[in-house]
Amino acid sequence: MQRLHLHLLSDSTGETLEMIAKAALAQFDGADVVRHFWPMVRSMQHLDRIMGEIAANPGLVLYTLVNAETRERLEQRCAALGLPSVAALDAVTDALQQQLGIQAKGRPGRQHMMDEAYFARVDAIQFTIAHDDGVGWENWEEADIVLAGVSRSSKTPTSIYLANRGYKVANIPIVVESPPPSMLFSLRRPLVVGLTTSPERLIAVRRNRLLSLNQAPETAYVDNEQVTREVQFARRMFADNGWPVIDVSRRSIEETAAAVINLYNERTAAGASGDGVKPI
């Protein structure tokens, strides 16, 4: 069966769009689909960057965009590439039938499926809360994703956001003086992703954190030399282990989570195609 790259574009969080795509794809047993998630598309410049990614992995484009100019630009660019673009609330199932080359089958029990999805999300949230900040490392193999990064690199909020999407996530702080559990380097099932940021951005975030706690704003925690050392140490660890890295310096939590989801989907697709699990 031919692989389909499915691009999901939204000018908001994209949660509704993702649910629509999941519901439609449930009609196609065994379909080889790689989902690419692009939320918060609110400028022409952002759209143009995404179109470069779409051109590299051509496929079906589903979108929920309110701005008429952005919609028109997307449709024009897709047409120029010879790619179908579909508003998500239109005939999603019909477009998937054409691209996948198989007939959608009527499937009863949709509400039951939604109930299962709801409980799976609750389970993911419970798992993620119980495995925050390096806690419960003995169970990391049960996770879908493990996020690693220095303190204040947005590991926890990104983990919670992903959990609300149904992913079981653990996260671990990378500390120079305290190496992480050895299990981190031998995980097979979870996707391990390194989160990094610039020392300048990290110092600003940490200083704000100290001020919010009414603590002295000038400590080793925000010392430029120390912070730079931490960031470099973490980056070397990521590189040595072949883990994909996301720079969160200029990303919102939603954008960081979307990047993680794309990495996860690509890794899952690589495994399903028989290529095995590879660093991304």
From Swiss-Prot:
One of its GO terms (molecular function) is ATP binding. Bifunctional serine/threonine kinase and phosphorylase involved in the regulation of the pyruvate, phosphate dikinase (PPDK) by catalyzing its phosphorylation/dephosphorylation. ADP binds at G149, V150, S151, R152, S153, S154, K155, T156. Its EC number is 2.7.11.32, 2.7.4.27. This is Putative pyruvate, phosphate dikinase regulatory protein. Pfam families: Kinase-PPPase. InterPro entries: Kinase-pyrophosphorylase (IPR005177), PPDK_reg (IPR026565). Keywords: Kinase, Nucleotide-binding, Serine/threonine-protein kinase, Transferase. It comes from Novosphingobium aromaticivorans (strain ATCC 700278 / DSM 12444 / CCUG 56034 / CIP 105152 / NBRC 16084 / F199). It catalyses: N(tele)-phospho-L-histidyl/L-threonyl-[pyruvate, phosphate dikinase] + ADP = N(tele)-phospho-L-histidyl/O-phospho-L-threonyl-[pyruvate, phosphate dikinase] + AMP + H(+); N(tele)-phospho-L-histidyl/O-phospho-L-threonyl-[pyruvate, phosphate dikinase] + phosphate + H(+) = N(tele)-phospho-L-histidyl/L-threonyl-[pyruvate, phosphate dikinase] + diphosphate. Belongs to the pyruvate, phosphate/water dikinase regulatory protein family. PDRP subfamily.
